[in-house]
Amino acid sequence: MQGAIARMCVLVAAAILNHPLLSPQENATLHDQDEELMARMREHEEMLEKEQAKLEKEFSQLTPEPENIGSEEEYSGYLWSSVVFLVFLVIEMFRMHGAHTEIAPFGDEDIYSEGGSLAPRLKALDKEVLNNFCDKCTYTSSNEIWRVREFVEGFADDLLESLRSVCDRDADMEVGDFVGIGSVFESWKVCKPLMCDLLVPFSPPDPFALQFHLWCSCSSNVPPNMQGCGKIKVSKSGGNEGCLCGSANMGEDMLCLLHNGNDVPSVERSPDDLLCTRNTSFLSKDQVMKWFQISVTKAWGRISHKYDFEVTFRNLDAAGALKVRFHSGKVVVLNMIPVVQLQDTDAYFVSHFPSGSESPPDPYWPLSFAVYERNLLKLISKRLPQNSCHLHCLQIVTFLHRKQASLTGRTALTNYHIKTVLLHLLLGKRASSWGTEHMESRLCDLLSFLHRSLQEKRLHHVMIGNSKVTELIQVPEIISRAEPVNLLRCLVLQAELHAQTLQHFNEMLKNAPALLQDYTPHWSNGLCLLGDGV
């Protein structure tokens, strides 16, 4: 009896595993596959009928035996039959899953779109409108950006030199030369007013030094929700820590046997004087921004008589957020951001983000790789075809994002996310695919990648833990070996924000044709008349 049941289980499992629908031929046509499937199904049907007749004959010949419920052999036989049958079923399920993956692979449109609706909306973007918009961007860039950069660099140099003269060289922070980052310095800025982001590095006076505690270091105690951040500890350096003349005012008639008369003893200051968080030795972003804002105000007061324009603070919560207004009405916006350089690298701990995104609480400082990103974009651009479309794609999407944000309000999506998507695409696609004739396809790729990232709530930082980047530029080893950081982690924790951001993106695509059409140049008597909206 047990043998017959086992044979029945094996027969059913074999029929499932060898079903013709589970083994399609990849290179066969649909007509050939249909005929072959029908033939195999008839063959299996005949085989099953023969086996069924054979099993019925065996069952009819069996003589009834007295039931022995306590028989250990009978239970063992049923158990083994069930185990064999379950094993075959598990194998069959895995084969069906693998067959489904091979038979019906998803295309890019299926992966990137929601219900297949993204691709048709992208096709609604007229090629002529895109080209006209890009011509306008090129015109604006070539005629304004370089003049604005030249002005900003000269003004920032003068302002920082005045700031150094205001500060006490023995007590205040030492300010270095600024570093230009962002869209203006990467030549893809499109919307007005033109905004220039400047990193202003500073360091503590002697004998103090900075120690860095990164989130990815082995001995780090940075919490998981502070990935991409670090703490900056202010410590005293040098060999004078055990000398009393450096920690107290001993009077002019006291002579230190460890130092000569030319050494000026310094009185130890409190953590607040060193811009640290209260009762700690870790540098405070709030204290730094307060110090920087006061210093910039004093510095501008010293040189304001030299200039024929007005300078005001745009945002009192963001130190160095300046607005320059000329008598003609033209406005130039500056973001002078106090930062701390990570040792001898091009990575900087920033006090705040110019985009206004939420900053982590003290004493955690977010780490910016904007200089590396600028260098990476510049290096990749040299390998692309002449008049490549990568910056035009970035300009189009950031323009649409800004215009949509003015209609529906701000969401979690920022221009930095869009630029990160572009860098991922530049690292993953051949250089020849970025020619100007491929602009529509690359624009579709960028929007599709961004849409998928928003749906999955996952967009990895392009510099952290990315082996493709280390092949092109020298990123600090501790950063290149770190685990990737998700830039959209906030969407995982906030369902309402995720829904708002997705709605913003869908509305942006819906309004894209109208927005681009409204802001394309109009030609009159051979002259390009540019609107004020860009």
Swiss-Prot record:
Disulfide bonds: none annotated. Glycans are attached at residue 27. The chain crosses the membrane at residues 75-91. Residues 92-534 are cytoplasmic. Keywords: Cell membrane, Coiled coil, Glycoprotein, Membrane, Nucleus, Signal, Transmembrane, Transmembrane helix. Its main location: membrane. InterPro entries: ITPRIP-like, Mab-21_HhH/H2TH-like, MAB21L/cGLR. Residues 1-15 form the signal peptide. Residues 16-74 are extracellular. It holds the Pfam family Mab-21_C. It comes from the Eukaryota. It is a single-pass type I membrane protein. Residues 25-63 form a coiled coil. Enhances Ca(2+)-mediated inhibition of inositol 1,4,5-triphosphate receptor (ITPR) Ca(2+) release. Belongs to the ITPRIP family. This is Inositol 1,4,5-trisphosphate receptor-interacting protein. It comes from Takifugu rubripes. The gene is itprip.
